[in-house]
Amino acid sequence: MIHRERMRDHFVTLVRIDSPSRQERALAMHLAEELHHLGAEVSFDEADRLVGGTVGNLVARIRGTRAGAAPFLLCAHMDTVGADVGIRPRVEGDVVSSDGTTILGADDKSGIAIICEVLRVLREEAIPHGELEIVFTICEEIGLLGARHLDVAQLHARTGLILDSSNPGHLITRAPAANRLQFTVRGLEAHAGVSPEKGINAIRIASEAVAAMRLGRLDDETTANIGTIEGGTAINIVPNTVTVHGETRSHDEAKLKIQTEHMVRCFEEAAARHLLSLDGVIHRGQVHCQVHRDYDRLFIPEGARIVQLVREAARALGREIALWQTGGGSDANILCAKGLEVANLGTGQREVHTVREHLVLSDMVRSAELVLETLRLQAA
C-alpha cells in the first residue's frame, strides 16, 4: 500500500533541494542515490552538454520480476520553473504549500515523489512487475529540452506514464502543438524632442502590430499570446529596435498555421505603413520574423494500450478516469513524437508557476495508487 506520510516527507525533502532549469545536479545526485538503494541501475545522458546545464537526464532501469511482462516507462522532470530557490514548504492538513514568497515545486517534484513511492512499495511487497525504466528529465520548463535531447532508442519501454499534471482523475491524451515567434522590429533613431519627424518609432510599429492581432483564446482548440516586449534606450530617443516574443498553440495544425501567419502578417503590415523620406532617401520600418516549432501535438487514441491499462486500473480501484485535453505541453508531446505511447497523469499539483502553488496530498495518494495498480496489471 502507498505510505502517505512517507511520500509526503519525501516530497518535502525534494522541494528543499534547489533545482531551477539547468541547475538540477544536486537533485539528480540525490535521486540517483535513492534509486540505487531501490535496486536500479542509474545513468545520465549528455543532454546537459547540449543545453548548457549541470547534469543530463537521469535514466534508471529496474529489472522485471515477471517474465514476459512488457517494459514500462515512468517519467517526471527535475527542474522547477523560474529562478526561485530556498523554498520553504509548509504542511497544513491535506495541503503542502510554500511560505508564499516562492513557488512550491510540486511541478514536478510531486511526480518524482510518486514514482519513488511506487518503486518502494513494489520492492517491499514483492509485487510482480515488468522491467521499469525511470526517466527524470532536465530543462522541461524552458522548452522541454531534456526530453527533446533524450535518445529513446536506448529505452526498452514503448509505453508509459508521465506524472506532470493536476487531477489524478484525468489522463491527458491530447495536448496542442505550439509555435514560438520572435519579431525584431527596426525603425530609425532620432532625437525625440528636436527632430522626432526624422525618426521611425519601432515601439509604435510593434504596438500597432500587437493591437491588430487576434490574441487569447481563439476557439476551443487554439490560443495565442504576446509575452514580452523589449526595446528602446531612453525617453528622449525615438527607438529604432524592439524585440517581441509570442506564441500560438492549437490542437489543429491548419489552425496553428493560420494563426502563425496572421501574427507574422500583422507585423509585416504595421512595418510597411511606416516610411519617410529623409534627404532624398526613403526609410521604411522593417521586421524580421522567426518562427520556431516548440513541440508537436499530443494525440493518443482511445484504444491505445496505455489508455486501456489506466482505465482498467481505475476500475480495479473503483474509480473513473477521464480522457482529457489540455492547453499545455509536456514531455509527453516530445516522447510521443519520438514514437512512444506516453500519457500524462495528474499528481495533485495546483496553481503551478505561481507563489500560490500547492499540492493536495490526498490527490497525490490517489495518483500513486493508480500508478501502482497500472504496473500490477501491466505484469498480469
Where are these regions (language model features)?
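Acidic/histidine-rich catalytic neighborhood of metal-dependent amide-processing enzymes
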Residues: 100-176, 218, 224, 235-236, ...
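Active-site metal-coordination/substrate-binding segment of hydrolases
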Residues: 53-57, 61, 68-136, 157, ...
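Metal-dependent amide/peptide-bond hydrolase catalytic core
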Residues: 202-380
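A non-catalytic alpha/beta surface segment that caps or lines the substrate-entry region
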Residues: 20-67
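Glycine/charged-rich beta-loop-alpha catalytic/anionic-binding loops adjacent to active sites
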Residues: 90-103, 186-190, 317-318, 349-353
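Acidic-glycine-rich active-site phosphate/pyrophosphate-binding loop
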Residues: 79-94, 172-184, 311-312, 343
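N-terminal capping segment at the start of a domain
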Residues: 1-25, 293, 350-354
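Acidic, glycine-rich active-site loops and adjacent beta-strand->loop/helix elements
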Residues: 48-50, 78-80, 135-143, 165-167, ...
